[in-house]
Amino acid sequence: MCDGSPKLDCSQLTVSPLPAKSLSASPHNPLFGFLNVYKPQGITSHDVVARLRRLTKIRQIGHTGTLDPFAEGVLPICIGKATRLIEYLNDDKEYLATVQFGAATSTYDLEGDKTFTSDIKVSKEDVIEGLKSFEGEISQLPPIYSAIKVKGKKLYEYARNNEEVEIQPRKVVIERIELKSFNKELQQAEILIKCSKGTYIRSIAHDLGENLGAGAHLIKLIRTQAGKFFIEKSVMLNDDLDVNKNLINPVEMLDIAKLEVNEEELNKIRNGQ
């Protein structure tokens, strides 16, 4: 019986991966699985979901890890009953961020109004030294233009209505942060960041500029990885995208302990024995 018996730990039970053909769509077996989509610039994460719903004629589609409209890169999509697994896709993310020094903005990115400008020129060495303060677990203040809810309202709603609201700092973990390139003339830095879920890269750009006294904001953001979803294996969102061909079995992407059983044992489990 599934009652905590030492013979079988049901809390760690998963059925072995099904063959790829089992993910094929049919009237009796609708699409089910993950899709590693490359979200382009200029559209929202929900726009990606809407396009896939039109393409597949399936309503049950969701995404994890929202990307801002100006950002691009890996956006994990859950299709069919795989949407029930969204909460398990909480792995670390990796980004390639381009930061512009010399001005801070209201949104911490290129879409906001300038709130501060400076003639201070930063050096490559300044940036490298400045990044050290973001290593490990840090306390981060989210941007006022974000979807975090405070007292039932999203922060950006307070911002748009010019209402004051107290923003609480949040603990996030920066596993890796390093300067990839620096353009002294343009005052732009390309930074690689591997971080925990919930990290705002815009805040890192803003805070870095503030710490260096020059002001800064994010002008480009590419998500290169989300857990086991890598940019190299992502698919473009085209009208001719073969969703079924590119579906990924959830078992391959989730770090859930599994127990392989034979047919006889599986039947016993199904019968509650």
Located regions from the model:
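Structural signature of FAD isoalloxazine-binding scaffolds in flavoprotein oxidoreductases
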Residues: I86-F101, V165-L179
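Extended alpha-helical targeting/anchoring segments
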Residues: S146, V150-E175
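The conserved catalytic core of RNA pseudouridine synthases
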Residues: R54-I58, E72, P76, V165-G213
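Glycine/acidic-rich beta-strand-loop module
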Residues: Q60-N90, E157
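Short, structured patches in soluble enzyme cores that scaffold and shape functional sites
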Residues: V99-F101, R160, R176-S181, I193-K197, ...
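Residue-level signal for inorganic ion chemistry
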Residues: I77, A97, G152, I204, ...
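Accessory RNA 3′-end/elbow-binding domains used by RNA modification enzymes
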Residues: C2-P40, T44-L67, V74, E125-I128, ...
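Acidic, low-complexity central loop/insert segments
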Residues: Y88-S139
